[in-house]
Amino acid sequence: MRVQITLACTETGDKNYITTKNKRNNPERLELKKYSPRLKRTTLHRETK
């Protein structure tokens, strides 16, 4: 079952990205390095509720 999630920057708190994930394969929170437009560099983004 795929669900839609939001990824928020850990440094600014901005919610920059929306993606989907499979809860059965990835039950824990997703963490990805993505580009932050405000900081103009890549930062760690975590899944938010």
UniProtKB/Swiss-Prot annotation:
Spell out the Basic and acidic residues composition-biased ranges: 25-34
Q: What Pfam families has UniProt attached to this entry?
A: Ribosomal_L33
- What's a single GO MF annotation on this record? structural constituent of ribosome
Any one GO CC term of the record? ribonucleoprotein complex
A biological process term (GO) from this entry = translation
Provide the family line: Belongs to the bacterial ribosomal protein bL33 family.
Full protein name: Large ribosomal subunit protein bL33
Species annotation: Lysinibacillus sphaericus (strain C3-41)
